[in-house]
Amino acid sequence: MLFKKYQFPINLFIIFEKINPVIYTSQVLTPNHYVCFIPSKWYYGLNLVLKKELFYNNSYLTDMSCIDTLKYDKFIPELNLLNNKRFLIYNIYYFYWIKVRLTLVQFSESKIESIDSVYKNASWLEREVGEMYGIKYTNKKDNRSLLLDYSRNEYPMLKDFPCEGYYEIYYDFFDNKLQYIKNEFIEL
């Protein structure tokens, strides 16, 4: 066996009992990894508990990302959290003392509460997800863009974003400025 099996902490089950999540785990592939689907209204409070609780205070947020479910046609009955929401946002946490990895998954439309006051590295991860998917964070301290132009409201990771983008951008050395040329889409 490659992994040493650690038990999921019982006090985390007690916290999860209130919010009624759907929890998945794999005993064969990665036995110390749990995936929990939670309602988005419990997102900030659950992050506070995971960071401030004495038993979990060595937890850290390792990754945050998003999935666009625009043309998602599969429906799993026990995952009734989708409810016509477009984005599936997931956070991956690691707990040092109990050697457990936890993934929190929530479904959201376009606004969720920021957790950058709880986890310091969440600011960068939220800026990245917000810029690529267009998700707005409430109570966020730093709303600067990372890669994209401030003047554009384009979100390149969405499924309805064209492959070639909306504009062709190049630097014109003769005029000494950026030039934007609108792409013309040709259907084959």
Over which residues does each language-model region extend?
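Terminal low-complexity/charged segments
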Residues: 1-188
